Amino acid sequence: MTARTCSIYKNKRIVCFGDSVTQGVPHVAPADTFAAILERRLNALYGPQVQFCASNAGVGGENTAEGLARIQRDVLDHSPDLVLIEFGLNDIRYEPAKRLSEEQFAENLREMHRLIAERGAAVIFMTPTPIIGAYHVYSQGTDYYKQWGDCNGLNAIYAEIIRQVARELEAPLCDIYAAFVQEAVKAEFRGETFDYRDLSVLSRYISSRDGVHPTAAGQELIAAELYAVIVTRDLLVTRV
């Protein structure tokens, strides 16, 4: 699968590079992915002076090693101005063919950043969405994750690795994991749950069908978080 191309010229190109969260499967229409929402909101903000194209280069089921294998075709060949890197949920899968060590995961992120930066593009690292263990098939189908409490326990460790790599490389971070957890905390405040750590309260944002993929509302939340990072840091356009 290759990145979506744009039918008309635009001044700024964003490539959203990641797994099924970026792709928007299996429950989200293409127009409701964070890539599409972000494109619309940035174009609404800057109007005709600057136009944006956000290409969706998400492929479901991929870890960072598989992402690196297609980075030339799906990212670099599109001459992006900004690349959003969203991986991690498949790097922690229990199957040996998918699972990557913490060290390899971090090194793959560094290599992605190096290749993109060499082309003169900016990078935003994204942490993964939380996993709702009660709905998640991997959490229920194996004892592998018990050493971390549950699958989301390991997910949180890999989210922290992304934060560390972003700090190390002095790259912007969009902390999606923290944003979703904050929504759970707000739900606890409103009395909708007795414990925000029971992430099932996030079923509006993360599908109860699988406990991992964002719903349309979750995609909108991701887009809003990315929008905030881009416009407050003037990553693509300096606002006058």
Regions found by a protein language model. Name each.
Residues 1-60, 65, 70-79:
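Serine-esterase "nucleophile elbow" of acetyl-processing enzymes
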Residues 8-10, 37-47, 66-239:
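Alpha-helical cap/lid subdomain in secreted, periplasmic
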Residues 1, 239-240:
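Short, solvent-exposed mixed-charge patches
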